[in-house]
Amino acid sequence: MRTLSSQLYSNGGLTWFQKKNQSSLFIKHLRVSKPSRVQLISAVQFRPCIDIHKGKVKQIVGSTLRDLKEDGSVLVTNFESDKSAEEYAKMYKEDGLTGGHVIMLGADPLSQAAAIGALHAYPGGLQVGGGINSENCMSYIEEGASHVIVTSYVFNNGKIDLERLKDIVSIVGKQRLILDLSCRKKDGRYAIVTDRWQKFSDVILDEKSLEFLGGFSDEFLVHGVDVEGKKLGIDEELVALLGNYSPIPVTYAGGVTVMDDVERIKDAGKGRVDVTVGSALDIFGGNLPYKDVVAWHHKQHSLH
């Protein structure tokens, strides 16, 4: 495994990965292995989503989400459903869609209850994220989540917090952990963003960081935050980066508007990047027929 820049990774004021032997000892202790890109040669999948805000299934412009203690007046909502999270989960199960994600866009009890309802409706078929940490991660697995999704918890002061990452891997296992590496462009590079996508970290999404983080997680989830929720088209450059360098399965979300965008993700990602569609779908108030995306998904699998 390559040694990463010591500027990226810190813990408790100590710098990690300054020397190759330090990296080797840490990796050996965690018992993680360097992933192989061979894992990614499979059919591209459509990964459905259920975004929950204050107990309701919504589609929002994620970059406008602020802490719930604020008045929320800046929140831009594209859609609010009259269907429950549980109903969406049942639909995804009936349509044979796996690996979708349930995201709680707030830590309120209503959102937590809605997420758990979805997990109960489709045990083992959905991943869950939003406020996940070492204390609550196993409870969501026990409620039926296939994986837990974490982002802000494993970042601290703009760096990767290795103690937290090590801790959560030891609890749920690499095979049930997904790292959300959602990012925004900054100075021409993609920087991972945390805290409801409001804070830039110092961690740049590139070949080295993807390779390193792939040793700790089963999959990546990456929202192109600059285009997410805006239905302006995909971030093709980001998709290409993921297709070229992700050593484990990765799902891209952001900007899909028409079926051609889904095909562009397949092509730009070299068949290695799965796709999530949100606001554009007719089940979320958009114009893109959900049934067409499901049919496309099953067609990909029939080709393999």
Swiss-Prot record:
GO cellular component: a single term: chloroplast
Listed pathway(s): Amino-acid biosynthesis; L-histidine biosynthesis; L-histidine from 5-phospho-alpha-D-ribose 1-diphosphate: step 4/9
GO molecular function per UniProt: 1-(5-phosphoribosyl)-5-[(5-phosphoribosylamino)methylideneamino]imidazole-4-carboxamide isomerase activity
SUPFAM superfamilies: Ribulose-phoshate binding barrel
Annotated localization: Plastid, Chloroplast
Similarity field: Belongs to the HisA/HisF family.
Stated name of the protein: 1-(5-phosphoribosyl)-5-[(5-phosphoribosylamino)methylideneamino] imidazole-4-carboxamide isomerase HISN3, chloroplastic
Source organism (scientific name): Arabidopsis thaliana (Mouse-ear cress)
Gene label: HISN3
